[in-house]
């Protein structure tokens, strides 16, 4: 595709940019078909030993979190809850569980999600941030950061960042499934519907 191709609107251009954004994002994490060792080292121990995960996000990022909920539960056997970031800050303090927390934000600066991250960090919970801005506040304050390389999005609806969030969450799931010794079990029990 020519870099000079014109599009009727920004969103259409960003849709066509998704394959390149995915390649750039996957290159951050993979060495051939394996998770890069530096990333594996960074992810080691991010999860809670009780196998509980909370995902806090808003908007399209929350939708990628809902997809991750299914992946992490089905393939890793983890107990996952997905919360609107704004609601977590209102009720999170009453939660006696201590789940590992994943925050997802395209900008890494979403105020409700940042407030949730700060709240759980103060309680000493393990945190992981997935953002499209590797120097964002969330990326810098979380215990582990998984940046995206989606590039700039000018259209309001998420396109490239949403697709890259899904890819990174899938890689995280595969890493956890392997770490937990569930890769064989996951593939044996997860059969496609006819």
Mark where each language-model region is.
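Glycine-rich phosphate-binding loops that contact phosphosugars or nucleotide phosphates
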Residues: 44-193
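Cofactor-/ligand-binding subdomain signature composed of acidic, glycine-rich
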Residues: 1-50, 163, 171-194
